[in-house]
Amino acid sequence: MLRIAVQAKGRLFEETMALLGESDIKISTTKRTLLVQSSNFPIEVLFLRDDDIPQTVATGVADLGIVGENEFMEKEEDAEIIKRLGFSKCRLSLAMPKDIEYPGLSWFNGKKIATSYPVILRNFLKKNGVNAEIHVITGSVEVSPGIGLADAIFDIVSSGSTLVSNRLKEVEVVMKSEALLIGNKNMSDEKKEVLEELLFRMNAVKTAEDKKYVLMNAPKDKLEEIIAVLPGMKSPTIMPLAQEGWCSVHTVLDEKRFWEIIGKLKGLGAEGILVLPIEKMIV
């Protein structure tokens, strides 16, 4: 049985549990304990603090973990990245008081920077030849300049609203982060087989994101032009209709280009366009 370490609460917890649920892996969270076994898949979930997950996976206490890339890079544990999951996105940035003009990275020379991510910050400063003092604190990093604890901060930024409320401005994006599926490097062959099934399900869910299944009635004399517009997976499905001169076209569209393509299809005479969500896609 695979053991996967998951953040115990917060946005990463919610999005992780949603992914497992969409992969038809049932985990009860109504009476949550430290370790919960799935009722329909050979996996158990270990609920932890996010900063404990990299070490837990590297040492083999858990086989897998879902953790923010920022925590994984900060801890520098010997585990492998299996899959980028594309959610819980944020960035780690340097920020400074908004009323001070920012001339470039050289401004940080001799300054004190407050952060909960000293390893990532130290590596960045060293790479860029900046000599600054790192002040490590946990929580409420953004208040440090306002109370005189530091000149600047290095912290997670999502929307930037927390910076604004503390009269700070983001001046350097050091790294972009998202949720990662990480794994122990010494999993048994039996566990690797379970992992393959888990990845198969996760990939089906992730591939379907931002995709729509589209059905339309199309005039046969415009069929070649309509097919040329469609950026489907391989080629659309074409089915004859009872009405002479018409056929039904089924395809998959990327939501980012949906309205652009639909407009072209209507211009070519497509009618009765039906759009459906896709839960999973196996390619």
UniProtKB/Swiss-Prot annotation:
Reactions mediated catalytically: 1-(5-phospho-beta-D-ribosyl)-ATP + diphosphate = 5-phospho-alpha-D-ribose 1-diphosphate + ATP
Pathway it works in: Amino-acid biosynthesis; L-histidine biosynthesis; L-histidine from 5-phospho-alpha-D-ribose 1-diphosphate: step 1/9
UniProt keyword Nuclease, yes or no: no
Cofactor(s) the protein needs: Mg(2+)
Localization per record: Cytoplasm
Enzyme class: transferase
InterPro entries reported in the protein's UniProt record: ATP-PRT_HisG_long, ATP_PRibTrfase_cat, ATP_PRibTrfase_CS, ATP_PRibTrfase_HisG, HisG_C, N-reg_PII-like_a/b, N-reg_PII/ATP_PRibTrfase_C
UniProt keyword terms in alphabetical order: Amino-acid biosynthesis, ATP-binding, Cytoplasm, Glycosyltransferase, Histidine biosynthesis, Magnesium, Metal-binding, Nucleotide-binding, Transferase
UniProt EC number: 2.4.2.17
Entry's Gene Ontology BP terms: L-histidine biosynthetic process
GO MF annotation terms: ATP binding; ATP phosphoribosyltransferase activity; magnesium ion binding
Free-text activity regulation comment from the record: Feedback inhibited by histidine.
One GO cellular component term: cytoplasm
Family that this chain belongs to: Belongs to the ATP phosphoribosyltransferase family. Long subfamily.
Function description: Catalyzes the condensation of ATP and 5-phosphoribose 1-diphosphate to form N'-(5'-phosphoribosyl)-ATP (PR-ATP). Has a crucial role in the pathway because the rate of histidine biosynthesis seems to be controlled primarily by regulation of HisG enzymatic activity.
The protein, known as: ATP phosphoribosyltransferase
Source organism per UniProt: Bacteroides thetaiotaomicron (strain ATCC 29148 / DSM 2079 / JCM 5827 / CCUG 10774 / NCTC 10582 / VPI-5482 / E50)
